């Protein structure tokens, strides 16, 4: 192998906040540096903060690392991989979806493991034997074989569950535009404590006696855009002191499913105060559990958060993590979760980024929500650099069940 053809994988130290100890991830691509040279791993003095399910903060001096191998980047040499320390090997672009397929192209070479990838490139893991690379250390592409589509909206139109505007028989659209935890016009259905927006729709009245004439939903070139922007002065007396208008869509009354894959393709807004999300809640209206397929803060659009919330042990816990990603405000990306009876896995642009065990209380049908919150303690309030409207552009939302493992699902709920 010619020295110039060898690519070595280099990582920069990064301090990350994650939601559960031992689930440390960041998105750090490999870089071509020409001729072979010694790889510098993350130093022992690079501290990392992690959160346990109980909320305690711990300092770790050896953060787990992800070694990313992408198609088209040539041969690679990786040093310092340690699965026992929760390091991961992420393989993108080679259509490798199962650990067995990766193990089939591994061979031991002395004290190293050589991975012969489809099309010719090889990856050498130095001082790592194949038996030291467990299935759990591999982050692969989403396996779409055996997936049966159970829900699809490409937003060529907007199917609104229009409560308050039509007789019951005409209200059977797909997307409900409030939480439904109070009456459709109640504050508890139109925002969450600490947030600064109201989730509006053309029927929304607030405390006024008639509709306020608001519509945060816009169809643009086959996408649904949810706009978050300052509330007009004329409606401020009627929206419980909130300062912004935005949108929420849910399948609470149209679709829920036990287990499966839930996916969205979207471009996210940039600017302090914006907080877009795609998530799942139980159809029986209990909480937790909850699966956050993604959450992003508008002032940190290169960081992606995922989490699974539970109260199975009596206390509210959250397991998941955050990771570095390309700027999510610049282009559309795919965000997905595969939720099964044993495990939950998150995917970004079709490649696994995180997994946790399925909590004991997460075995009942859940429905989908997508919303653009504005303001609050976590995203902060919009500032002088925030540009309005903030636009959460959704290309599609889809759901699948996996056969034959998943039980019958995709159940419908009456209005």
Residue ranges of each PLM-predicted region?
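Short, exposed beta-strand/loop patches in secreted or surface proteins that constitute
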Residues: 58-60, 97, 103-108, 214-219
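Low-complexity acidic/polar repeat-biased segments
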Residues: 35-38, 104-144
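Acidic, glycine-rich calcium-binding repeat modules characteristic of RTX/beta-roll
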Residues: 36-96
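Acidic glycine-/aspartate-rich tracts in secreted/extracellular proteins
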Residues: 71-73, 81-98, 120-121, 128-131, ...
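Low-complexity, Pro/Thr/Ser/Gly/Ala-rich linker/spacer regions in secreted
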Residues: 35, 43-62, 135-149, 403-415
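Hydrophobic single-pass membrane-insertion segments
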Residues: 23-34
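GH16 jelly-roll
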Residues: 3-5, 20-22, 142-415
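N-terminal Sec-pathway targeting helices
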Residues: 2-15
């Amino acid at each position: 192998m010619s020295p110039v053809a060898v690519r070595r994988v280099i990582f920069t130290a990064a301090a990350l906040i994650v939601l559960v100890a031992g689930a440390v991830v960041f998105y750090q691509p490999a870089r071509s540096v020409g001729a072979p040279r010694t790889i510098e791993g993350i130093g022992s003095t690079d501290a990392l903060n992690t959160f346990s399910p109980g909320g305690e903060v711990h300092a770790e001096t050896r953060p787990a690392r992800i070694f990313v191998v992408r198609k088209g980047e040539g041969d690679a040499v990786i040093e310092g991989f340690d699965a026992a320390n929760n390091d991961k090997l992420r393989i993108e672009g080679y259509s490798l979806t199962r650990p067995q397929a990766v193990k089939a192209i591994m061979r031991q070479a002395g004290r190293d493991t050589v991975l012969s990838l489809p099309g010719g490139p090889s990856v050498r893991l130095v001082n790592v034997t194949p038996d030291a690379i467990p299935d759990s250390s591999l982050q692969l592409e989403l396996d779409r074989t055996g997936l049966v589509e159970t829900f699809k909206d490409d937003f060529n139109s907007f199917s609104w569950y229009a409560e308050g505007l039509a007789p019951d028989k005409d209200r059977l659209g797909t997307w409900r535009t409030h939480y439904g935890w109070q009456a459709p016009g109640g504050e508890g259905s139109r925002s969450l404590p600490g947030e600064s927006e109201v989730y509006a729709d053309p029927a929304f009245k607030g405390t006024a006696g008639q509709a306020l004439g608001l519509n945060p939903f816009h169809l643009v070139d086959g996408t649904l855009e949810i706009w978050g922007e300052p509330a007009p002065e004329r409606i401020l007396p009627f929206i419980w002191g909130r300062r912004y208008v935005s949108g929420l869509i849910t399948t609470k009354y149209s679709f829920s499913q036990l287990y499966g894959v839930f996916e969205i393709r979207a471009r996210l807004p940039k600017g302090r105060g914006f907080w877009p999300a795609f998530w799942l809640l139980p159809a029986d209206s209990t909480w937790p559990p909850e699966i956050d397929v993604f959450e992003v803060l508008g002032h940190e659009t290169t960081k992606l958060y995922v989490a699974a919330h539970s109260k199975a042990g009596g206390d509210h816990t959250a397991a998941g993590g955050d990771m570095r990603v390309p700027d999510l405000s610049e282009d559309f990306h795919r965000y997905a979760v595969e939720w099964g009876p044993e495990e939950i896995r998150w995917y970004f642009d079709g490649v696994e980024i995180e997994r946790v065990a399925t909590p004991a209380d997460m075995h009942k049908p859940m429905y989908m929500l997508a919303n653009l919150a504005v303001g609050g303690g976590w995203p902060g309030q919009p500032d002088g650099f925030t540009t309005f409207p903030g636009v959460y552009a959704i290309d599609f939302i889809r759901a699948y069940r996996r056969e034959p493992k998943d039980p019958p699902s995709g159940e419908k709920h009456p209005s």
